[in-house]
Every structure is written in structure tokens, then in C-alpha cells.
A protein has these predicted regions:
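Short pre-catalytic strand/loop immediately N-terminal to key active-site residues, enriched for Gly-Thr
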Residues: 157-161, 181-188, 242-244
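Conserved beta-ketoacyl condensing-enzyme motif
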Residues: 8, 29-177, 220
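Short Gly/aromatic-enriched secondary-structure transition segments
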Residues: 20-32
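Acidic, glycine-rich active-site loops and adjacent beta-strand->loop/helix elements
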Residues: 12-14, 120-123, 188-192, 216-221
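Extreme N-terminal starter segment of soluble prokaryotic enzymes
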Residues: 2-9
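Active-site-proximal alpha-helical scaffold in enzymes
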Residues: 83-95, 166-179, 183-215, 248-261
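Short acidic, glycine/serine/threonine-rich loops at helix termini
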Residues: 19, 127-132, 197, 222-228
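Glycine-/small-residue-rich "gating" segment that lines the acyl/pantetheine channel
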Residues: 138-154, 198, 202, 217-261
Length: 261
């Protein structure tokens, strides 16, 4: 069976520069400084308090989610919201149509031929949500497994886990846009997004889909994520042209990978 030629027809980046290809291009052309003092959880004693945060006015999650799916917003962490915003931007950039971007028109491509491959990191839970449960389970500063199972877990909401499973960004994206083709989530750290794009290209190349939503998303400015990077000595003041230091960021990007035919 002949292989299909694969092309990228749209991009949807989201990050400290804002949302969309134009926002990214503008930031690059104007040398816009993106690393700023973190707006939350300062004074943690980390190697750096700088962070690249998505501006609050970049997008509203209600604008990229149809009314039929808005009840699910309450179980969306920043990683999921970034994935949905990036996907919406990429679809519009590629002039495709889905049941969400163009609800009154016929989707292009066929939903059965639209796949989704996304990279995702280890999503950290909100400290506010875990705080009460941990306080009960660790009255003397050490977690008591028996207390955690008997009393701590009762303080978590029933839908708590649905906010933090790494496959949830792809789950929400495929539901919102009706993508019923091959779907997968790559949880391989920094390589996850590249692996997702590579798999998407292979899916289209062999003819299992006409197009795929491919990329990744992660929130590395979460205090737990920042602390994890600090303890592993991966966090530090980022200095241009030096190979030491790293500045945490949140964001992601989705590409539209299509068959040229």
C-alpha cells in the first residue's frame, strides 16, 4: 500500500507570549521578554523565582469549549485548558472545521478520520485540594497510611482524579472536537510532544487518518513541579548562551498534521 505524504498545515502555540501563531511570531520579532517573577508561590527558597506564565487574558476557557461541555470545566487543570486553547487555535489556523469551531457546517476532515496524539507530563494536583486531606492524614508531619485511607481520601472530591490523569488533555480535546480517529497520549517527559508528533505523522502516512491533532502541553510553574525541578537541581537562573539553569514555564502547542493528498 502506498504511503501518504505528510504536511503540517496549522499551528496553535500557547505560552507566556499569549495564544496563536501571530502572538508567537510577534514575540520572536520584538524580542519580547517572557520570563517574569512568578505571580504565585513566591518565597519558596527555590533556585529561581522566575517563570514563563500564560497571561490571564490570553484566552478564556469558555470561549474554546462548547456549551455542551462546559460542565467539565470544573475538572480541568491548566494542562487541559492549554491543550484545548492550542487545539482550537491550530484548527482555525489550518482552516479545518470541527463540530465546535463550525457547529453549523460539515466537519472537515471526517471526524472518523481525525486523530489526536498529545504529549503530557506528570500533572501535579492543586495544593488547596490536597491540603485538607494531607492535614488529616499527617497530624504530626508524617503521613499515616491508615488515616489517609480512612479519613484523608474522604476530603477529596469524587471527580478529583479526572483533573490530573495525563491522558485527560487528549480526552477533552477529542470529545470537544469530535475526533474519533486514532488517539494516544505520550507520557515521556520532555520528549512526549516530539513522540506524539512523530506518531501522528506515521498514522497519517499509513492512511489510518486524514489528519491528526499533534503536540503537547504541561504546566511546569505549579509549585510542586517547581519544587521537584529544584530538588533535582534542574532549576536555576537561565543565562543566555550558557548551558546551566532553567526557567519553568507553562504552555504547549498543537500542530495539524495532514495528508498532502
Amino acid at each position: 500500500m502506498p504511503l501518504h505524504n505528510v504536511v503540517v498545515t496549522g499551528i496553535g502555540p500557547v505560552g507566556a507570549f499569549g495564544l496563536g501563531a501571530d502572538a508567537l511570531s510577534s514575540a520572536l520579532q520584538t524580542n519580547q521578554p517572557l520570563a517574569q517573577p512568578a505571580t504565585k508561590n513566591q518565597g519558596l527558597g527555590l533556585a529561581t523565582d522566575l517563570a514563563c506564565e500564560i497571561p490571564a487574558d490570553s484566552f478564556k476557557i469558555r470561549d474554546v469549549v462548547p456549551k455542551s461541555h462546559r460542565k467539565a470545566i470544573k475538572v480541568m487543570c491548566p494542562d487541559i485548558e492549554s491543550a484545548l486553547a492550542a487545539t482550537d487555535s491550530a484548527i482555525r489556523h489550518a482552516n479545518l472545521r470541527t463540530t465546535t469551531t463550525h457547529p453549523e457546517e460539515t466537519p472537515i476532515p471526517d471526524p472518523l478520520r481525525l486523530g489526536c496524539q498529545l504529549g503530557a507530563g506528570l500533572i501535579a494536583a492543586d495544593i488547596e485540594e490536597l491540603g485538607g486531606a494531607m492535614t488529616v492524614a499527617a497530624p504530626e508531619g508524617v503521613v499515616d497510611v491508615q488515616l489517609w485511607g480512612r479519613e484523608g481520601m474522604e476530603r477529596l472530591t469524587p471527580l478529583w482524579m479526572l483533573k490530573y490523569l495525563p491522558n485527560m488533555p487528549a480526552c477533552h480535546v477529542t470529545i470537544v472536537h469530535g475526533a474519533q480517529g486514532p488517539s494516544n497520549t505520550m507520557t515521556c517527559g520532555e520528549t512526549g510532544s516530539m513522540l506524539a508528533i512523530t506518531e501522528a505523522a506515521r498514522v497519517v502516512e499509513r492512511g489510518d487518518a486524514d489528519a491528526c491533532l499533534a503536540g503537547g502541553t504541561e504546566d511546569r510553574i505549579h509549585p510542586v513541579q517547581r519544587l521537584r525541578q529544584h530538588l533535582s537541581e534542574r532549576l536555576g537562573e537561565g543565562v543566555p548562551f550558557q548551558d546551566t539553569g532553567a526557567t519553568p514555564a507553562q504552555g504547549g502547542a498543537v500542530l495539524i498534521v495532514e495528508s498532502l493528498e
